[in-house]
Amino acid sequence: LLIMSKSYIIDSVRSPIAMKNSDMLGFRSDDLSACIIKGLLDRNSNMNKDDIEDLVTGCAFPEGPQGMLMARSISILADLPLSTGGKVVNRFCGSSMDSVHQVSQAIVAGDIKAGIASGVEDMFTVPMGGFVPDFNERLNEKEFYIGMGETAENLAKELDISREDQEDFSILSHKKALDAIDNNKFDNEIIP
């Protein structure tokens, strides 16, 4: 008989979204992530950091300053116990979501009692494709390397979404985000 635990998301926070030449430029991903985790723990004082057994970090380009098992570095910089594990998940755009899944699965399976799922990407430090891209040309025969733009075009055609509909959606999305910023709707989720 196997009794499964339940997992819960008790809080979520993030960094501000940065633009090129913004104030965020120059911050290391691991330092910023550690700052966010410290902020998360500070606002959840009922959470004992000694109970956190794993940190799973999603990262599409875990190389350069985002390499060397960055989750472990973040864990140490965030003053989590040395016993807290760390691993990096790379599923490109789905990396952070997969980190949430993996922490939840570990809790449900009884492997850990508490964990932190996170994600990080510094698009200004690591060039698109990585530092030394070495794509297997044979995969081009199978249409494996399709960029996001081409994927979007294929989906728009398949789902009959016009360019005008896409632009209207984008404008509405930006208006909603600006309205949320103006009305302080994001204040509780952004650290620092």
Predicted regions and their residues:
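Alpha-helical membrane segments and immediately flanking helix-loop junctions
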Residues: F92
